[in-house]
A protein has these predicted regions:
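A short acidic-to-branched-hydrophobic micro-motif
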Residues: 117-138
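Short phosphate-engaging motifs
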Residues: 80, 129, 176
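Membrane-interface anchoring determinants
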Residues: 2-22
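Juxtamembrane extracytoplasmic segments of single-/few-pass membrane proteins
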Residues: 15-20, 28-118
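Short acidic-hydrophobic surface loop/beta-edge motif
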Residues: 97, 108-111, 121-123, 148-149, ...
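Envelope-exposed proteins and targeting segments
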Residues: 100, 117-119, 129, 155, ...
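A short, solvent-exposed beta-edge/loop patch
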Residues: 140-194
Length: 194
């Protein structure tokens, strides 16, 4: 008896523990991801997201324009907000992003796939770096996250909330783009309730 090799546990018993461990790791990951996305703008890489794709495409086309980037300039801000609000069907208040170093250039009306119409507000900093805010009516559930067009292209921080689909797009470092998006989001929500 003492000279014999120890008996091995049945294969099903060792596989059960492996399966239980894998399930536990999966649950921790899912729960952690859920909790992280509840109250902040998190990161999601979802190539099927139309809102982010449309916002990035519009930004790439119009942010590069010098003379024809907007239809209505910032000097007509009240008209711009009223016009875009009426056309998109949402109350739209252009966020003041001066604290983040960006001034409103103006805005334009764009087509937006299933949503119909979207507003695009264009902002610029002192160095000429441009970001855009893309806003459309959205009936989807609340989602917050980011979407990246390509490794070296513009990135969109987007959210769907209170009937609004919004994306802030730019080629800024991720932390700065998220800070701008949070400020824009807060001001849009404040504008909705005023």
């Amino acid at each position: 008896v003492l000279g014999e090799a120890p008996a091995r546990a049945p294969a099903w018993r060792s596989r059960w523990w492996l399966s239980a461990a894998a399930a536990a790791v999966l649950m921790v990951g899912v729960l952690g991801g859920y909790v992280a996305g509840i109250d902040g703008i998190g990161r999601i890489n979802d190539s099927d997201d139309q809102l982010a794709e449309q916002a990035i495409a519009a930004h790439v086309i119009y942010a590069a324009e010098k003379r024809h980037a907007v239809e209505v300039p910032a000097s007509e801000k009240d008209h711009l907000q009223t016009w875009l609000s009426n056309r998109v069907g949402l109350k739209l208040v252009a966020p003041d992003l001066a604290a983040e170093g960006f001034q409103l250039v103006g805005g334009r009306l764009l087509p937006a796939g299933d949503q119909g119409k979207a507003a695009m507000l264009l902002y610029e900093d002192a160095k000429g770096e441009r970001i855009s805010l893309f806003v459309t009516a959205e009936s989807s559930q609340t989602t917050k996250g980011t979407y990246t067009a390509e490794a070296d292209g513009p990135e969109a921080v987007y959210w769907l909330d209170k009937g609004y689909g919004c994306a802030v797009v730019g080629s800024l470092p991720p932390e700065r783009l998220s800070a701008v998006a949070k400020r824009a989001y807060g001001q849009l929500l404040a504008g909705i309730s005023s």
